[in-house]
UniProtKB/Swiss-Prot annotation:
ATP binds at S260, G261, G262, V263, D264, S265, S266. Residues 233-425 form the GMPS ATP-PPase domain. Pfam families: GATase, GMP_synt_C, NAD_synthase. Keywords: ATP-binding, Glutamine amidotransferase, GMP biosynthesis, Ligase, Nucleotide-binding, Purine biosynthesis. PROSITE patterns: GATASE_TYPE_1, GMPS_ATP_PPASE. GO terms for cellular component: cytosol. Homodimer. Gene3D superfamilies: 3.30.300.10, 3.40.50.880, HUPs. This is GMP synthase [glutamine-hydrolyzing]. Its EC number is 6.3.5.2. InterPro entries: Class_I_gatase-like (IPR029062), GATASE (IPR017926), GMP_synth_C (IPR001674), GMP_synth_GATase (IPR004739), GMP_synthase (IPR022955), GMPS_ATP_PPase_dom (IPR025777), NAD/GMP_synthase (IPR022310), Rossmann-like_a/b/a_fold (IPR014729). The lineage of its organism: Bacteria, Pseudomonadati, Pseudomonadota, Gammaproteobacteria, Moraxellales. HAMAP family: GMP_synthase. Catalyzes the synthesis of GMP from XMP.
Length: 550
């Protein structure tokens, strides 16, 4: 009897444990399956800030995607958004053929937020009026809160004012029926308005830019309070989902990845290794145009520490030979790209049974490669890490980052255990030092530049300025300058230092480094590198200058 009762109790306990396991699996599966079910659709009218909207929404823990304003009704319904955001844009609603939101946007029954031009076209399409403003507002403005709705109800920068970023000429002069004013400026009576019954909201300013105080909170109010979205879009959930998707897509097949040591390819490598382990092989092409000890660092991180199979192709002599005598920047880029593809292809042919090619394509690449039917989309750019591979290398693509922004990729890398120094290091161009050596590329020049750049980075990190600048690097000038060392004359090369501050790399200003720091960097470079006699600091902003010199 006792034995029977004991067995019965044990049986119940096993059932309970099994139910917990099943529940745990269910929770994981639910999380993985539904982290994109709460979703915001962003219709892009051509604003330079449109990608920022998508990033801010995702920072609030909600999945979002951005499409051109002329998205079809069928596609909008298929996307099944919890809410829709209409971006700003450079057009005027008074211009013939200016873009309009698809009418279905206002018929779906979901909340809509119009920003700047998005607010104007929404107002006009719903029966309001838009007219050219007598005073154009560009830059900071103080907005007075007139009435608190769900969008601005809990926002308060000063007593009743918000510091916002304006960028508009036209303005809404008459609201559609059902709308009421929630905020204004002296020259813009309808800086924000809403129709709470239909859950339509509009703001004339840009909440997505960092210059707008409480802008992130405003967008969070829209996606959480108004649209009812949760906050499941997190690095941990994204990794779980990607691992599951990669295993389903790849199965037992082999994957090849061109590893550059940059942020995107590094995160792809770590993610694939977590998902499929030894099925991944990376090819690292060392072209002799990398930063000091960069090749060894990449091998140590991925091959030694993480156990990833990495093939290092030492191709320095090959690249330098191909570049010999060439001084045109664009031709240098093409030569470097061509040689990289050929080296990568040669290594790929040595491997048997590889079915998939992994790439570090990220969401801005996808957005910028999409053309709108009415020509409002961004200019197409080439972005694939190993684009242009020979036809006889037939791979299926694996792009696990193609719906993620750069900041999301960095967060994934941190969560996956990659070091901060790798994830948050400054951008490095694909052609490497090949476009930071002006004119012809020679090994002598590359060796000098590597040392100078390393000293620059050492001092930026030691002073705390590395993380305050978006990008910094040294540039080799193929001219010599006279210097004095002791009682002797030195006739040696010139090094330029470049450091910039920027958020989006579309515009940038030169970093205002302390004179004492610039002095220390300059002194070290000239003292420690005998082939350098002069150091200059680049004080050009973008525009008109570009960030890179070539």
């Amino acid at each position: 009897m006792l034995i029977e009762r004991t067995c019965a109790i044990l049986g119940k306990m096993l059932e309970y444990c099994a139910s917990l396991v099943a529940l745990h699996s269910c929770v994981i599966m639910t999380t993985n399956t539904h982290i994109t079910d709460d979703r915001i659709l962003i219709l892009d009218f051509g604003s330079q800030y449109s990608q920022l909207i998508a990033r801010r929404v995702r920072e609030a823990g909600v999945y979002s995607e951005m499409y051109a304003f002329d998205m079809s009704e069928e596609d909008i319904r298929a996307f099944n958004p919890n809410g829709i955001i209409l971006s700003g844009g450079p057009e005027s609603v008074h211009e013939e053929g200016s873009p309009r939101a698809p009418q279905v946007v206002f018929e779906l029954g979901v909340p809509v937020l119009g920003i700047c031009y998005g607010f104007q076209t929404m107002s006009e399409q719903l029966g309001g009026k838009v007219e050219p403003g007598t005073v154009h507002e560009f830059g900071y403005a103080e907005v007075d809160i007139q009435q608190r709705d769900q969008l601005v109800g809990n926002l308060q920068d000063r007593e009743n004012q918000l510091h916002v970023w304006m960028s508009h000429g036209d303005k809404v002069s008459r609201l559609p029926e059902g709308f009421s004013t929630t905020a204004s400026t002296p020259s813009c009576p309808f800086a924000a308005a809403s129709d709470e019954a239909r859950r339509f909201y509009g703001v004339q300013f840009h909440p997505e830019v960092t210059h707008t105080a409480k802008g992130a909170e405003l967008l969070a109010n829209f996606v959480h309070k108004i649209c009812g979205c949760g906050g499941l879009w997190t690095p941990e959930h994204i990794i779980d989902l990607r691992v599951e998707q990669l295993r389903a897509q790849i199965g037992d097949e082999k994957v090849l990845l061109g590893l550059s040591g940059g942020v995107d390819s590094s995160v792809v490598a770590a993610l694939l290794h977590k998902a499929i382990g030894d099925q991944l092989t990376c090819v690292f092409v060392d072209n002799g145009l990398l930063r000091l000890n960069e090749g060894d660092q990449v091998m140590q991180m991925f091959a030694d520490n993480m156990g990833i199979r990495v093939i290092r192709a030492d191709a320095e002599e090959r690249f330098l030979t191909a570049l010999a005598g060439e001084v045109d920047p664009e031709k240098k880029r093409k030569i470097i790209g061509r040689e990289f593809i050929e080296v990568f292809a040669e290594e790929a042919r040595k491997l048997d049974g590889v079915k998939f090619l992994a790439q570090g394509t990220i969401y801005p690449d996808v957005i910028e490669s999409a053309a709108s039917k009415q020509g409002k989309a961004h200019v197409i750019k080439s972005h694939h890490n190993v684009g242009g591979l020979p036809d006889d290398l037939e791979f299926e693509l694996v792009e696990p980052l193609r719906d993620l922004f750069k900041d999301e990729v960095r967060k994934l890398g941190t969560t996956l255990g990659l070091p901060h120094s790798m994830i948050y290091r400054h951008p490095f161009p694909g052609p490497g030092l090949g476009v930071r050596i002006l004119g012809e590329v020679k090994k002598e020049y590359a060796d000098i530049l590597r040392l100078a750049d390393d000293i620059f980075m050492q001092e930026l990190r030691a002073s705390g300025w590395y993380d305050k600048t978006a990008q910094a690097f040294a540039v080799f000038q193929p001219v010599k300058s006279v210097g004095v060392v002791g009682d002797g004359r030195r006739y040696a090369w010139v090094i330029a230092l470049r450091a910039v501050e920027t958020v989006d790399f579309m515009t940038a200003r030169f970093a205002h480094l302390p004179y004492e720091l610039v002095d220390k960097i300059s002194t070290r470079i000239m003292n420690e590198i005998k082939d350098v006699s002069r150091v200059v600091y680049d004080v050009s902003s973008k525009p008109p200058a570009t960030i890179e010199w070539e």
